Amino acid sequence: MKEQKWIHEGLITESLPNGMFRVRLDNVDNEDLILGYVSGRIRRSFIRILPGXRVKIEVSRXDSTRGRIIYRLRNKDSNB
């Protein structure tokens, strides 16, 4: 059976080498940063992820310190 994953929204705080990012989750009580990597669909689509951007991240129940960035959210303050 496929492993269940949590999906959270968060804020990119730091860009690391090899498509890795530090992400601060919104709906978690503690202020821990988790390590996020970019999903293949985002890589193929050449979607730019920069510090300050809001993302959806998929976190495994077994290892809650790492996650996969699956979607970049639009900025609320832009006129798009």
Curated annotation (Swiss-Prot):
Cellular component per GO? chloroplast; cytosol
Q: Where in the cell is it found?
A: Plastid, Chloroplast
GO MF annotation, one: rRNA binding
Keywords from UniProt, A to Z, are: Chloroplast, Initiation factor, Plastid, Protein biosynthesis, RNA-binding, rRNA-binding
Membrane spanning residue stretches: none
Under PANTHER family, the record lists: TRANSLATION INITIATION FACTOR IF-1, CHLOROPLASTIC (PTHR33370:SF1)
Q: What organism does this protein naturally occur in?
A: Illicium parviflorum
The principal location of this protein is plastid
Q: Which residues form the S1-like domain?
A: 1-74
What is the stated purpose of this protein?
One of the essential components for the initiation of protein synthesis. Stabilizes the binding of IF-2 and IF-3 on the 30S subunit to which N-formylmethionyl-tRNA(fMet) subsequently binds. Helps modulate mRNA selection, yielding the 30S pre-initiation complex (PIC). Upon addition of the 50S ribosomal subunit IF-1, IF-2 and IF-3 are released leaving the mature 70S translation initiation complex.
What domain of life?
Eukaryota
Q: Which residues are connected by disulfide bridges in this protein?
A: none
Q: Which SUPFAM superfamilies match?
A: Nucleic acid-binding proteins (SSF50249)
Give the encoding gene's name. Answer: infA
Q: How does it assemble?
A: Component of the 30S ribosomal translation pre-initiation complex which assembles on the 30S ribosome in the order IF-2 and IF-3, IF-1 and N-formylmethionyl-tRNA(fMet); mRNA recruitment can occur at any time during PIC assembly.
Mind telling me which Pfam families this protein's record contains? eIF-1a (PF01176)
Tell me its family. Answer: Belongs to the IF-1 family.
The answer to whether keyword Membrane applies is no
Q: What is this protein called?
A: Translation initiation factor IF-1, chloroplastic
